[in-house]
Amino acid sequence: MNHQSRKADAFDKIRKYDNDLVKYYEIEIIDYEPISAKAYKLVTNANNEYFFKETNDVALEKYQYLANQGISNILYPLENIEKRFITKTTQRSFYINNYIQQIPIREDAKVANMFNELNTLHNQTSMRKTLDPSKSRVKFDELSSQLDYKFRVLEQMVRRVESRPLDIFSMPILENYHTILNAKKELVKLQKRIISSVKARESVNYSFLHNNPSIDHLLNVRGVNYLTSIDNGKTGISSLDMAKFYVKNESYDIDFKSMILNEYYDENHLFYYDYFRYLVLVIYIKRMPVSTEDYINASTFVETSNCITRYFNFSDYKEETRYPNETNNN
Protein backbone atom coordinates (compact mmCIF):
# COMPACT_ATOMS: atom_id res chain seq x y z
CA MET A 1 0.00 0.00 0.00
CA ASN A 2 1.48 3.38 -1.02
CA HIS A 3 1.65 6.47 1.17
CA GLN A 4 -1.43 8.17 -0.30
CA SER A 5 -3.53 5.04 0.09
CA ARG A 6 -2.45 4.63 3.72
CA LYS A 7 -3.34 8.23 4.46
CA ALA A 8 -6.72 7.96 2.77
CA ASP A 9 -7.56 4.76 4.67
CA ALA A 10 -6.59 6.40 7.95
CA PHE A 11 -8.73 9.52 7.40
CA ASP A 12 -12.04 8.17 8.68
CA LYS A 13 -10.34 6.40 11.57
CA ILE A 14 -8.45 9.33 13.01
CA ARG A 15 -11.29 11.78 12.41
CA LYS A 16 -13.49 9.78 14.78
CA TYR A 17 -11.32 11.12 17.59
CA ASP A 18 -11.70 14.81 16.71
CA ASN A 19 -14.25 15.57 19.43
CA ASP A 20 -12.36 13.57 22.07
CA LEU A 21 -9.12 15.40 21.33
CA VAL A 22 -10.88 18.74 21.72
CA LYS A 23 -12.72 17.60 24.87
CA TYR A 24 -9.84 15.94 26.72
CA TYR A 25 -6.77 17.78 25.40
CA GLU A 26 -8.18 21.00 23.93
CA ILE A 27 -6.42 20.46 20.62
CA GLU A 28 -7.86 20.63 17.11
CA ILE A 29 -6.34 18.58 14.29
CA ILE A 30 -5.66 20.18 10.92
CA ASP A 31 -3.36 17.47 9.53
CA TYR A 32 -2.13 13.98 10.35
CA GLU A 33 0.36 11.39 9.14
CA PRO A 34 -0.07 7.61 9.62
CA ILE A 35 2.91 6.01 11.38
CA SER A 36 1.45 2.54 11.87
CA ALA A 37 -1.97 0.91 12.02
CA LYS A 38 -2.50 2.37 15.50
CA ALA A 39 -0.21 5.41 15.60
CA TYR A 40 -0.33 8.83 13.95
CA LYS A 41 1.52 12.09 13.89
CA LEU A 42 -0.96 14.93 14.48
CA VAL A 43 -0.63 18.60 13.59
CA THR A 44 -2.92 21.08 15.36
CA ASN A 45 -4.30 24.49 14.43
CA ALA A 46 -1.65 25.96 16.76
CA ASN A 47 0.99 24.22 14.63
CA ASN A 48 1.94 21.88 17.48
CA GLU A 49 2.83 18.27 16.69
CA TYR A 50 1.67 15.28 18.72
CA PHE A 51 2.10 11.52 18.69
CA PHE A 52 -1.25 9.72 18.91
CA LYS A 53 -1.64 6.01 19.63
CA GLU A 54 -4.59 3.70 20.13
CA THR A 55 -4.05 1.38 23.07
CA ASN A 56 -5.78 -1.05 25.42
CA ASP A 57 -7.75 -0.17 28.54
CA VAL A 58 -5.26 -1.73 30.97
CA ALA A 59 -2.41 0.48 29.70
CA LEU A 60 -3.57 3.13 32.18
CA GLU A 61 -2.85 0.82 35.11
CA LYS A 62 0.65 0.08 33.78
CA TYR A 63 1.66 3.69 33.25
CA GLN A 64 0.14 4.68 36.59
CA TYR A 65 1.96 1.85 38.39
CA LEU A 66 5.33 2.87 36.94
CA ALA A 67 4.70 6.55 37.68
CA ASN A 68 3.78 5.72 41.29
CA GLN A 69 7.01 3.71 41.58
CA GLY A 70 8.97 6.75 40.44
CA ILE A 71 10.36 5.03 37.34
CA SER A 72 12.02 7.84 35.42
CA ASN A 73 13.14 6.19 32.16
CA ILE A 74 9.59 5.80 30.80
CA LEU A 75 8.17 8.36 28.36
CA TYR A 76 4.77 8.86 29.97
CA PRO A 77 1.78 10.06 27.92
CA LEU A 78 0.52 13.60 28.38
CA GLU A 79 -2.20 13.81 30.99
CA ASN A 80 -5.67 14.73 29.77
CA ILE A 81 -7.90 17.27 31.53
CA GLU A 82 -8.93 14.50 33.96
CA LYS A 83 -5.25 14.03 34.91
CA ARG A 84 -5.16 10.58 33.30
CA PHE A 85 -2.46 9.18 31.02
CA ILE A 86 -5.00 7.20 28.96
CA THR A 87 -8.29 8.49 27.55
CA LYS A 88 -11.12 5.97 27.25
CA THR A 89 -13.76 6.74 24.62
CA THR A 90 -16.60 5.02 22.82
CA GLN A 91 -14.10 4.29 20.04
CA ARG A 92 -11.02 2.98 21.83
CA SER A 93 -8.56 3.98 24.49
CA PHE A 94 -5.76 6.24 23.29
CA TYR A 95 -3.01 8.54 24.50
CA ILE A 96 -0.95 11.37 23.08
CA ASN A 97 2.58 12.67 23.53
CA ASN A 98 4.50 15.58 22.17
CA TYR A 99 5.93 14.46 18.84
CA ILE A 100 9.68 14.07 19.24
CA GLN A 101 11.80 14.25 16.11
CA GLN A 102 14.74 11.87 16.45
CA ILE A 103 18.27 12.55 15.24
CA PRO A 104 19.58 9.46 13.41
CA ILE A 105 22.15 7.51 15.41
CA ARG A 106 23.92 4.22 14.77
CA GLU A 107 21.68 1.20 15.21
CA ASP A 108 24.23 -0.65 17.34
CA ALA A 109 24.38 2.34 19.69
CA LYS A 110 20.60 2.23 20.03
CA VAL A 111 20.79 -1.48 20.83
CA ALA A 112 23.31 -0.86 23.62
CA ASN A 113 21.18 2.00 24.98
CA MET A 114 18.05 -0.16 24.89
CA PHE A 115 19.83 -2.90 26.83
CA ASN A 116 20.81 -0.40 29.53
CA GLU A 117 17.31 1.05 29.83
CA LEU A 118 15.69 -2.39 30.04
CA ASN A 119 18.07 -3.31 32.85
CA THR A 120 17.22 -0.07 34.64
CA LEU A 121 13.51 -0.82 34.34
CA HIS A 122 13.97 -4.39 35.58
CA ASN A 123 16.17 -3.41 38.52
CA GLN A 124 14.01 -0.50 39.67
CA THR A 125 10.81 -2.59 39.66
CA SER A 126 12.32 -5.75 41.10
CA MET A 127 10.54 -7.75 43.81
CA ARG A 128 11.32 -11.16 45.27
CA LYS A 129 8.86 -13.99 44.70
CA THR A 130 8.92 -17.74 45.11
CA LEU A 131 8.52 -19.81 41.96
CA ASP A 132 5.10 -21.46 42.00
CA PRO A 133 5.00 -25.02 40.60
CA SER A 134 1.21 -24.97 40.15
CA LYS A 135 1.33 -21.89 37.91
CA SER A 136 4.52 -22.83 36.10
CA ARG A 137 3.34 -26.33 35.23
CA VAL A 138 0.44 -25.05 33.13
CA LYS A 139 2.73 -22.75 31.15
CA PHE A 140 5.41 -25.39 30.60
CA ASP A 141 2.86 -28.04 29.62
CA GLU A 142 1.39 -25.70 27.01
CA LEU A 143 4.82 -24.69 25.72
CA SER A 144 6.04 -28.29 25.60
CA SER A 145 2.96 -29.28 23.63
CA GLN A 146 3.56 -26.49 21.11
CA LEU A 147 7.23 -27.41 20.70
CA ASP A 148 6.51 -31.13 20.37
CA TYR A 149 4.01 -30.39 17.63
CA LYS A 150 6.45 -28.09 15.82
CA PHE A 151 9.27 -30.63 15.93
CA ARG A 152 6.91 -33.34 14.61
CA VAL A 153 5.88 -31.11 11.72
CA LEU A 154 9.53 -30.33 10.95
CA GLU A 155 10.45 -34.02 11.05
CA GLN A 156 7.60 -34.94 8.71
CA MET A 157 8.71 -32.24 6.30
CA VAL A 158 12.31 -33.47 6.37
CA ARG A 159 11.21 -37.07 5.77
CA ARG A 160 9.20 -35.89 2.78
CA VAL A 161 12.24 -34.10 1.39
CA GLU A 162 14.43 -37.17 1.96
CA SER A 163 12.08 -39.32 -0.10
CA ARG A 164 12.68 -37.22 -3.22
CA PRO A 165 15.75 -36.69 -5.41
CA LEU A 166 18.13 -34.04 -4.09
CA ASP A 167 17.90 -30.56 -5.56
CA ILE A 168 19.05 -27.03 -4.75
CA PHE A 169 16.24 -26.57 -2.21
CA SER A 170 16.34 -29.94 -0.45
CA MET A 171 20.09 -29.80 0.21
CA PRO A 172 19.97 -26.78 2.60
CA ILE A 173 17.11 -28.42 4.50
CA LEU A 174 18.93 -31.73 4.99
CA GLU A 175 22.29 -30.09 5.69
CA ASN A 176 20.87 -27.89 8.46
CA TYR A 177 18.40 -30.27 10.09
CA HIS A 178 21.03 -31.52 12.56
CA THR A 179 21.27 -27.98 13.99
CA ILE A 180 17.52 -28.00 14.64
CA LEU A 181 17.91 -31.36 16.41
CA ASN A 182 20.75 -29.95 18.52
CA ALA A 183 18.41 -27.15 19.57
CA LYS A 184 15.81 -29.76 20.55
CA LYS A 185 18.33 -31.55 22.79
CA GLU A 186 19.36 -28.26 24.34
CA LEU A 187 15.73 -27.36 25.05
CA VAL A 188 15.13 -30.68 26.82
CA LYS A 189 18.23 -30.20 28.98
CA LEU A 190 17.38 -26.61 29.90
CA GLN A 191 13.74 -27.37 30.63
CA LYS A 192 14.75 -30.10 33.09
CA ARG A 193 16.98 -27.64 34.92
CA ILE A 194 14.33 -24.92 34.97
CA ILE A 195 11.69 -27.34 36.26
CA SER A 196 14.15 -28.41 38.96
CA SER A 197 14.37 -24.77 40.09
CA VAL A 198 10.59 -24.44 40.04
CA LYS A 199 10.06 -27.61 42.07
CA ALA A 200 12.57 -26.34 44.60
CA ARG A 201 10.48 -23.16 44.88
CA GLU A 202 13.53 -20.99 44.41
CA SER A 203 13.24 -17.32 45.28
CA VAL A 204 13.75 -15.14 42.20
CA ASN A 205 13.32 -11.53 41.13
CA TYR A 206 10.18 -10.53 39.27
CA SER A 207 10.16 -7.20 37.47
CA PHE A 208 8.02 -5.10 35.18
CA LEU A 209 8.77 -6.24 31.63
CA HIS A 210 8.49 -4.07 28.55
CA ASN A 211 7.45 -7.21 26.65
CA ASN A 212 8.07 -5.70 23.22
CA PRO A 213 11.70 -4.52 23.46
CA SER A 214 12.25 -3.17 19.97
CA ILE A 215 14.78 -0.38 19.48
CA ASP A 216 11.89 1.52 17.86
CA HIS A 217 10.55 1.83 21.40
CA LEU A 218 13.48 3.91 22.62
CA LEU A 219 13.54 7.69 22.25
CA ASN A 220 16.26 10.15 23.08
CA VAL A 221 15.02 13.45 24.50
CA ARG A 222 17.73 16.09 24.94
CA GLY A 223 20.37 13.44 25.60
CA VAL A 224 18.24 11.26 27.90
CA ASN A 225 16.92 7.86 26.79
CA TYR A 226 13.32 6.84 27.47
CA LEU A 227 11.41 3.62 26.90
CA THR A 228 8.11 4.03 25.05
CA SER A 229 5.07 1.89 24.21
CA ILE A 230 4.84 -0.18 27.38
CA ASP A 231 1.18 -0.93 26.57
CA ASN A 232 1.82 -4.70 26.50
CA GLY A 233 4.09 -4.71 29.54
CA LYS A 234 3.61 -7.16 32.38
CA THR A 235 5.20 -8.48 35.55
CA GLY A 236 7.53 -11.41 34.99
CA ILE A 237 11.12 -12.63 34.96
CA SER A 238 13.52 -10.33 33.13
CA SER A 239 14.97 -13.24 31.13
CA LEU A 240 11.88 -13.01 28.90
CA ASP A 241 12.52 -9.38 27.96
CA MET A 242 16.18 -10.11 27.31
CA ALA A 243 15.45 -13.20 25.21
CA LYS A 244 13.10 -11.18 22.99
CA PHE A 245 15.61 -8.33 22.87
CA TYR A 246 18.49 -10.66 21.94
CA VAL A 247 16.55 -12.39 19.16
CA LYS A 248 15.53 -9.06 17.65
CA ASN A 249 19.04 -7.61 17.73
CA GLU A 250 21.66 -10.38 17.82
CA SER A 251 22.73 -9.59 14.24
CA TYR A 252 24.20 -6.24 15.34
CA ASP A 253 27.89 -5.94 16.19
CA ILE A 254 27.31 -5.81 19.94
CA ASP A 255 29.17 -7.78 22.63
CA PHE A 256 26.09 -9.68 23.77
CA LYS A 257 28.28 -12.29 25.43
CA SER A 258 29.68 -9.97 28.06
CA MET A 259 26.42 -8.03 28.40
CA ILE A 260 24.31 -11.10 29.15
CA LEU A 261 27.09 -12.75 31.15
CA ASN A 262 27.46 -9.76 33.47
CA GLU A 263 23.72 -9.45 34.01
CA TYR A 264 22.55 -13.07 34.14
CA TYR A 265 25.33 -15.56 34.70
CA ASP A 266 25.79 -16.72 38.29
CA GLU A 267 27.26 -20.18 38.72
CA ASN A 268 25.53 -20.41 42.11
CA HIS A 269 22.13 -19.56 40.66
CA LEU A 270 21.76 -20.46 36.98
CA PHE A 271 18.00 -20.00 36.75
CA TYR A 272 17.99 -16.60 35.00
CA TYR A 273 20.68 -17.64 32.52
CA ASP A 274 19.06 -21.02 31.82
CA TYR A 275 15.67 -19.39 31.36
CA PHE A 276 17.12 -16.81 28.97
CA ARG A 277 18.79 -19.52 26.86
CA TYR A 278 15.65 -21.64 26.88
CA LEU A 279 13.43 -18.79 25.72
CA VAL A 280 15.81 -17.80 22.92
CA LEU A 281 15.59 -21.29 21.43
CA VAL A 282 11.82 -21.41 21.96
CA ILE A 283 11.44 -18.21 19.94
CA TYR A 284 13.66 -19.48 17.13
CA ILE A 285 11.79 -22.78 16.81
CA LYS A 286 8.26 -21.41 17.20
CA ARG A 287 8.74 -18.71 14.58
CA MET A 288 9.94 -21.17 11.89
CA PRO A 289 7.30 -21.24 9.14
CA VAL A 290 6.63 -24.56 7.43
CA SER A 291 5.53 -24.17 3.83
CA THR A 292 4.45 -26.41 0.99
CA GLU A 293 7.14 -24.64 -1.04
CA ASP A 294 10.63 -26.07 -0.53
CA TYR A 295 12.39 -22.84 -1.49
CA ILE A 296 10.72 -21.15 1.50
CA ASN A 297 11.60 -24.04 3.81
CA ALA A 298 15.20 -24.00 2.57
CA SER A 299 15.54 -20.31 3.39
CA THR A 300 13.93 -20.85 6.79
CA PHE A 301 16.25 -23.72 7.68
CA VAL A 302 19.37 -21.79 6.70
CA GLU A 303 18.32 -18.65 8.57
CA THR A 304 17.24 -20.50 11.73
CA SER A 305 20.29 -22.75 11.66
CA ASN A 306 22.57 -19.72 11.46
CA CYS A 307 20.78 -18.12 14.42
CA ILE A 308 21.02 -21.30 16.48
CA THR A 309 24.70 -21.72 15.60
CA ARG A 310 25.36 -18.17 16.82
CA TYR A 311 23.37 -19.05 19.94
CA PHE A 312 25.62 -22.03 20.70
CA ASN A 313 28.72 -19.92 20.08
CA PHE A 314 27.22 -17.31 22.38
CA SER A 315 26.20 -19.63 25.22
CA ASP A 316 29.17 -21.99 25.33
CA TYR A 317 31.76 -19.49 26.52
CA LYS A 318 31.25 -20.77 30.07
CA GLU A 319 31.57 -24.37 31.13
CA GLU A 320 28.27 -25.93 32.10
CA THR A 321 27.71 -26.03 35.84
CA ARG A 322 26.22 -29.39 36.71
CA TYR A 323 23.33 -29.67 39.09
CA PRO A 324 23.84 -32.10 41.98
CA ASN A 325 21.41 -34.62 40.49
CA GLU A 326 23.13 -34.64 37.09
CA THR A 327 25.50 -37.56 36.64
CA ASN A 328 28.85 -37.38 34.93
CA ASN A 329 29.36 -40.32 32.59
CA ASN A 330 32.97 -39.52 31.81
Model-derived regions, located:
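Helical subdomain adjoining the active site within ATP-dependent kinase catalytic cores
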Residues: 164-167, 193, 197, 294-330
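A glycine-centered beta->alpha junction motif in the catalytic cores
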Residues: 92-107, 154-163, 284-302
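Active-site activation/catalytic loop segments of kinase-like enzymes and analogous catalytic loops
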Residues: 238-272, 282-313
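ATP-dependent phospho-/nucleotidyl transfer catalytic cores
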Residues: 134-208, 259, 312-313
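Active-site acidic catalytic loop and adjacent metal/ATP-binding pocket
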Residues: 39, 77, 189-242
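N-terminal ordered "arm"
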Residues: 24-40, 45-58
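Juxta-kinase regulatory segment immediately upstream of eukaryotic protein kinase catalytic domains
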Residues: 1-29
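ATP-binding pocket architecture of kinase catalytic cores
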Residues: 44-135
